[in-house]
Amino acid sequence: MRIAIASGKGGTGKTTLATNLAWTVASNGRTAAYLDCDVEEPNGHLFLKPRIERDEPIHRLIPVVDPALCTHCGLCSKTCRYGAIACVGRQTLVFTELCHACGGCMLVCPVDAIREEPKPIGRLRIGASGPVRFIDGTLDVGEAMSPPAIR
């Protein structure tokens, strides 16, 4: 069974309910995991006080244009629905804050001038609090895209 506690409103008690539910389920001999997907301000750790076993970076793939190969044809710019890549004169600019990491620009480039490189955007912590498995993620300050960290 999977139970998700979600709401768009802050301060409604989601974390209190979710941490207590996970603890109660695990205390009754069932397998329970607490996943704090509020990557902008996770605070389940304040209630569960987990022992962190792993702490690793979260990455998002961003396009990097090789200026030596780029012909400035503009296909990448026309393909990007988010305006994250633009051809201006003899330059191809990448706006990483707008990029959704779909890889479309890389796929349409006729000269393979675009590759993807990982960019760190936050941290993933994995551990346990007694019988409860614990996972949370934290987005770096200034990062605008939370879905890659939640995945």
Regions found by a protein language model. Give the residues of each.
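P-loop NTPase switch/communication element
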Residues: E40-L61, I126-V132
